[in-house]
Amino acid sequence: MLVNAWQKTFFFNFSQERVNITGAGRTDSGVHALAQVAHFDLKKKIETTKFLRGINQLIGNKPVTVLKINKTNKKFHARFDAKKRTYQYTIVNRQSPLALQKNKAWHIRKKLNTKLMEKGAKLLLGTHDFSTYRSASCGAKSPIKTIKKVSVKKNGEKIIVKFTSKSFLQQQVRSMVGCIKYLGDGTWNFDDFKKSFKAKNRLKCAPPAPSCGLYLRKIIY
């Protein structure tokens, strides 16, 4: 939807040019983005303030907004120039149903052991073959990725899981969280979790966490 609005803005209001938009990352349906970056090439000069106002008017009341527009060099690529991406997964661990956080977090009623979840998450640090957490439809050439940072933090009834890497496989974060959840709720012990990871086999993965709790949190260039 955002790409379509951008193209309409350019084509009808600004440049009469067809513009291709490239985002920094692709997300599954239902996943949120707190920080998304995109680039486009344009021959005609535009007034950025006017453009920003125009694109947000076209977006209307949809839950999307463009916060800033910057001019950059011709070689910049929103996807390939990114050095780090941080994804955040939000779990609400309580008995009562969600209200304001509905469709924005994973509601889990069974009490979770966050210390054990953190132990499992830290096992994923470093460079590994993440085939267990790779979607069957993933188009990446290699399952090898490097997790640079992980954290599992509990704040009241909220549990926030974060992963930082240069890039991720399709459904990797949701799959890792699904396995960490199995560890936290007692479905698996730590040895089960480790065997699943080391198996490098998608069939050994727990069900992926639902998309509603996942957020693209930060992109660093």
Where are these regions (language model features)?
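Structured-RNA-binding interfaces characteristic of tRNA pseudouridine synthases
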Residues: 1-221
